[in-house]
């Protein structure tokens, strides 16, 4: 598939505790403005006919219900922290409705943590009722997502669990070992990181387990490497939208991937310098350097004022500092395209 058009819905724009915070009586946590009610950070991306989720935190169930989601082509995980992975058990509902395993794309260290945190998912023979996942190991290289990438239909067998239905009608267990659940990418062809490559010209990773489809059934995703304190994490570029959360620094080599954006999302946790997140001033500096048409702040905490006040403050700061981007706070339910 070609073209830059993508549509992103902010499902959650709050910190790891969400907003309001349990027990807090500050003005933001008591606000009646729905824009001050923030689920844990997550986004739903509709891109060239595919529906892609970025992160599945503890609010995943309510986020899916709020958007009426019945199908996901892929779940991309930025990193391994619970506010980004804590809702993955709830893909069971989509397994049942969609009759497909959830296609999850994550780095190797994230996969290793998922195995520790969800041991019943990786127990063999499979535990009846456990969610069905297919995991694809990625890194900072571009990779391909294909629509309905698995042709294997899930069938629920009472008191036994999910099986795959083969073309001849035979039912077989979904996985007999860990190897059956993991698809690692082959080596990608080396390419210069340039504006041209950021638009999709370089050779992406292709996963062996993906069913063969036409070019009209696939998109190339461009990961953005960053650090969350010392933890390597990923953001993602979808056409002319880049979604970045939970970063405190971006390597110089990654900025070429961020050229020519219409929309940029950046995490902003507080006014002050933070060990694992961008401060407000760091975010403004990045917006001015990258110069997207619009910059949206997410992963917001209750340390910022209520939405209306914060938006006016951002307008003033951008005007005073001559920031070359329109910077606004995102809020749950906001749609950009």
Model-derived features: where do they sit?
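Binuclear metal-dependent hydrolase catalytic cores
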Residues: 1-244, 309-337
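Binuclear metal-ion centers of metallo-dependent hydrolases, dominated by the metallo-beta-lactamase
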Residues: 184, 196, 250-337
């Amino acid at each position: 598939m070609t073209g830059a058009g993508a549509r992103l819905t902010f499902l959650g724009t709050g910190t790891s505790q969400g907003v309001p915070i349990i027990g807090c009586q500050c003005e933001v946590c008591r606000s009646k403005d729905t824009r001050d009610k923030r689920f844990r950070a997550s986004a739903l991306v509709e891109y060239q006919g595919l529906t892609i989720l970025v992160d599945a935190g503890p609010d995943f169930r309510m986020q899916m219900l709020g958007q009426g989601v019945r199908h996901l082509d892929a779940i991309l995980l930025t990193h391994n922290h619970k506010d980004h992975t804590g809702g993955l058990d709830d893909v069971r509902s989509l397994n049942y409705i969609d009759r497909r395993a959830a296609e999850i794309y994550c780095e190797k260290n994230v996969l290793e943590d998922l195995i520790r945190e969800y041991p019943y998912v990786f127990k063999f023979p499979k535990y009846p009722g456990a969610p069905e996942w297919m995991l694809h190991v990625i890194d900072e290289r571009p990779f391909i997502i294909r629509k309905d990438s698995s042709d294997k239909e899930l069938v629920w067998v009472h008191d036994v669990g999910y099986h795959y239905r083969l073309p001849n009608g035979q039912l077989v267990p979904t996985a007999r070992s860990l190897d059956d659940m993991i698809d690692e990418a082959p080596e990608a062809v080396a390419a210069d990181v340039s504006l041209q490559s950021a638009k999709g010209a370089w050779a992406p990773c292709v996963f062996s387990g993906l069913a063969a489809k036409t070019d009209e059934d696939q998109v190339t995703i461009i990961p953005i490497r960053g650090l969350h304190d010392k933890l390597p994490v990923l953001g993602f570029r979808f056409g002319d939208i880049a979604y970045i959360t939970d970063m405190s620094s971006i390597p110089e080599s990654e900025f070429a991937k961020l050229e020519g954006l219409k929309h940029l999302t950046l995490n902003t946790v507080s006014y002050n310098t933070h060990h694992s997140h961008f401060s407000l001033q760091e975010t403004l500096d990045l917006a001015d350097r990258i110069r997207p048409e619009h910059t949206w702040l997410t992963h917001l905490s209750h340390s910022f004022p209520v939405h209306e006040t914060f938006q006016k403050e951002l307008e003033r700061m951008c005007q005073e500092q001559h920031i070359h981007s329109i910077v606004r706070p995102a809020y749950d339910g906001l749609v950009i395209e």
